[in-house]
Amino acid sequence: MKSNFYHLAARTAVRPAIRPILAGIAALSLFGAGLAHADVDASKSSVIATTKQMNVPVDGKFKKFSAQLNFDPAKPTAGSANVSIDTGSYDLGADDYNKQAQGKEWFDSATYPAATFVSSAIAPAGGNQYKITGKLTIKGKSQTVVVPVTVTAQGATQTFDGSLPIKRSQFDVGTGEWKDTSVVADEVVIKFHLVASKK
């Protein structure tokens, strides 16, 4: 039997809880994609993750993360990224939705308080394009991902833009009644825009 939360989500086209939760999973992989030896200005940056529930797209957002990063466009292959995301910091704009996101069927934040991305290689992809390969771990499940990034430099400021699709099922996010991908899409697509000041 579906939970009351399911019926609320099914009726609500503007702010269903599950779609933003799924969007957040994918965001985890992107913070390692371009915070290139710099401090990110959160007020000017955005990470928008989109998935679909019953064919309706919805966005979502993480509030806490830490990153140890090293990236020089002149020596991209020597760069590295090590990122930790607080899975309990995903904010859907309502306390009950946030608690749902932290629950066992989704991030299980009590058991897995952090999701991580650790780069293994950074490769030029032509012009100001780069591909960052690394291991993304969520709920104890790891997958190798390749994050495409566009880096733009203006004076002391760098911006990093890109998108990445992942499958929530590969990380056991959305289990039980939420495992049905005909209701909640398996694919999550992240678009990010990060603004940073060079150190």
Q: Which stretches of residues belong to each language-model region?
A:
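Bacterial N-terminal signal peptides that target proteins for export
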Residues: 3-24
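Cleavable N-terminal signal peptides
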Residues: 23-25, 34-36
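Hydrophobic membrane-targeting alpha-helices
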Residues: 18, 29-34
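Low-complexity, acidic/polar, glycine-enriched regions of mature
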Residues: 36-199
